Structure formats: C-alpha cells, structure tokens
Amino acid sequence: MIYIYVAGKANTMAKYVITYDIGTTGIKTCLIEIDESMKILASSTAGYNLYVDDETGVKGGAEQDADEWWEAMCTTTKTVLNKTPHVTKEMIEGISFCSAMQGLVLVDKEGNCIRRPMTYMDQRAREELKKGIAHGVQVAGAEVTKLLKYLRYTGAVSSSVKDPIWKYKWVEAHEPENFKKIYKWLDIKEYLILRASGEFVMTQDSAFGTLLYDTRKGHEGWCNPVCKMVGVNIEHMPTIKKSTEEVGKITEKAAKELGLAEGTAVYGGGGDASLIGVGAGAVEIGDTHIYSGTSGWVGTVVPEQIVDAGAMMAAIVGVDPEAYNYFGELETSNKCVSWVKDHLALDEIGVFLKKYGNASDSFEQVEFNLYDYLEEVIDTIPAGSNGVVFTPWLHGNRCPFEDPNAAGMFFNIRLETGKTELIRAVVEGICFHMRWMLERQEQKVSKYKKEDTVRFCGGGALGETTCQILSDILQRDVVVVESPQNIGAVGAAACIAVGMKLIPTMKDVKKLIPVKTTYHPNKANKAVYDRNFQVFKNLYKDNKKNFEILNG
C-alpha cells in the first residue's frame, strides 16, 4: 500500500530511497520507505521552463535548460530530507529516476551540455526527417527498404519528426561546431545520472527510445546497421544498463549540491512510458493504463513486440525483461488543461486560486486547486458539452495519426455556448483521444486482455469528475490508485526494490499498489458520447488539408 505522511520515526527494518519524477514542466521528488509496502514519507515539487518556438529561435523548437533540471532536483531533495528529520541522508540507500523520454541531451567529455537540450516535443527537424526516411516509395511515412530494416532490427521505425534521431541530424546540419563537440548522446534522466555520478550511461528503455537499439534476442545493444543507415556515429552512444541496476555512486561534488551522502547508490530507473504503468500497478500481461500528464498515452503490457506503423504505435522495451509496453501517445494531454488556466479562464481561475489557495502554495498544491476549480465548473454542464467538441492537438499529434500540422479547435460553437461548455469540452476532448488510441490498440492486443478495466493515472486522475467522464466515454470501469500524480516516483522506487532484491520481479509490485477508487460507466451518457466521438474523429480527416495550409 502507498501512504503519504511526513512525521514519524525511522523503521529499522525498512530501506529508504529518494526518487525523481522528471516531467515536462516540473520535477516531483519523493522520499519512500520500502518494507512490506511502499510508503511515500514526503514529497516536493519544483517547476522549470519549457522554451518553445520563438524562444528557441526555430519554428517547432521545444527546449529546456539542463541546469534548471539539476537545480530543481537539488532543491527538492533537500526539502524532502528536511520534512523527514528521522531519516538522515546516510540512511538513503539509493536514488532513482523516472523521466520524460526521447529528449536529446548532447554532452562533451567533461559532461557539459553542448547546447540546450531538445525535448520530445521538438519538431524542428522536418527536412532531416524527409531526407532521412520520408521519401521515395513509402509505407506509414517511411521509405520501404529502410522501414523493413528498422523493423528487422529494432521492431519500430523512426518516422516521426519528434524522434531524437532527426534532432541529432538537425544539429549536424545546422550547428556543425556543436556537433564536433559531441562525446555522448544522452536522454533527460541519463544527464541527471551523469551529473550525480559522473557515469555516461543509458538504460535499455531509453536506448530503445532512440530507435537505434537492436531488440533481437541475443543481439541486444546499439544496432550498427541502423546507425549506419541513418548516419549516426555509434561512438556517440553511451554504455547501456538495466533499469534495476546500480549504475554508479553519488560523487563528492554532487553530494554537497544535493544534500545527500557521498557514495549513495544511483540506480538506472526508467522513462515515464516504462515506469508510470509500473507505479499504477499495470504490470501483468494484458494490463492497460491511461496516463494524463503534460502529455498522455495509452499503454498495454504485452509479451511480444507489436508494431502498428500506420497508427505510430509500437511495443516498446520497458523495465521488465519479460514484457513490452504497447504504446500510443498524445502530445498535449493535461497541457490542454494548462492552456485553459493560462488563456481561456485566466481571470476566473485566478480568483478561485486566491480564494482557496495562497501565495505560498507549492507547485503541486496549485495543481490540486486547479482541479478543484475544474470539477466545480464542468459539473454544471451536461455530458457532451451541449454539442461542443474540442481537439487536443495543441502541439501537433503522433497517434493514431502523425501530423505536426494538426492543431486544437473548438467545433460547433453557437450563440448560447458559454465558457463553461468550452472548458468541459477540453476535458472530454482529451478523453475522446484516449478512446481513439485505446480502440486502435485493441485491434492488436485484445487476445492478451483478461479484463476491460483501465488504470487511470497522472495529474488528470486527480479530478473525480474527469475520472467519471473517462469511464463514460470508454464505457468501461476506470480504477485509480492512491496518489496518482506520484506514480512515476513509485515506479522508480520499484527499480531500486528489484535491484536490491527486496522484491523478486516487477510483477510483484502490483500487490503493493491497491486500487483506491473504481468508476463505473454511466450508461445514460453512452449515446451522446458515441455521437460526439464520431464527430471528433471526423474533424481531423475533414481538416487535414486546412491544417497543412495554415501550419505547413
């Protein structure tokens, strides 16, 4: 079971760990006690900037400052230790990570960032994608012979402009002086592992995320044929480690900055696509979870590699060596809710936050207050938002169609339409897209599923009304675990638990993460949601050319 508390006495039989959930807009750090259960003793959050478009100097750019990641990590580490004086820094057995994936962090031999890291959202490399794979006779956006080679070795294909290969090639083409300085290509958590331990490594799931990883049994590792095909210097790729492996120890310098003991073990951890499902308890074959954070996805645990190139879905390497995560992504999920806060209802939300919050509220508490506001507002509008339909493609889209030109829209606004309908339509639009991806997934994975229940997690699962809307739109049970916003950190703790042999396998995590609430679908809302869902899917098909005219 997962608990959250601050005060207490040290359990002499327990192990204490600190884990970091590094998201798109902030870090969530948790001090966790591992015993017969996993208990979150304290948590702390800190935000950092996401620089997009004009802020990067490039159309489609999405970058972050690595020093801001590290500063947030140091600040929150000290905070959780201060909240738990009965747990000293010497009692921390290890640290681990869960982070956003498919970033591009290029470092020199000293471990310094050569340029500001690009995030998974970056879509500047359109020309590199076209030259690299999107030319000639194509299937699912990839030249046929290259597609076949990809599928033979990696089980997936780099046919999205947001894939890190094309960002790497963009640096080669546009920043040759920076390219010459590259020692290693890292992802986000790998950079923080380097900063903490001095080790240049990458976990298997992150390596798969580069789409340069050979997944064939007995051949696991960097794939030389694919690297040659796309023009990647294999010497730029770091040593590959398991997610449950101790990859290094905290250095003297890092220990002083973090407030931890020198020599504390550093574990590999995993990407968010690998560990959020683990933290939600979706660890057995056939288990499905839906995540709604800044981005969002639908993931199902499967025993083999599966590819649906036409829908940009693939079974990715995770932290369990005996399973894969069949995965479809929405680029902007709860980011759409942030857009509501910042633009559509800025004044109303500001008044609400002043009334129910205060200036000292943490990054996380503001998120809680925001969902309280949304719950209060959308409850006043009937299912279907009085016919208004929203598309959550605020930064293009990846699954079940790849189109960086796709954009958000409100459809069917009339004279009587109010702001509250628009706000509810945003929440419904996110859920419609999740249903679209889930239905496409189940064309491939239905044979593995033991039940239709879906585990819902991330910040989006904080709102009871949002959870009920998802259940109604999917027309199936939706279950939520305790602290759904902290599950990435719990998944990272599971890596340490397995690495320290406190639990045998990742599948054993499920019994430690019981369901808190189950939402059952309201059959009365099925007809209106089915109607709006059909319109939702039509909106992309009917506007694809218009998106290209306006955004291409």
Describe each PLM feature range.
Residues 28-30, 197-198, 202, 358-408:
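Conserved ATP-utilizing enzyme core subdomain
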Residues 55-60, 67, 74-365, 369:
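Glycine-rich phosphate-binding/catalytic subdomain of phosphoryl-transfer
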Residues 381-479:
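Activation-segment/catalytic-loop signature of the eukaryotic protein kinase fold
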Residues 2-116, 127, 255-256, 260-265, ...:
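N-terminal glycine/serine-rich phosphate-binding loop of ATP-dependent small-molecule kinases
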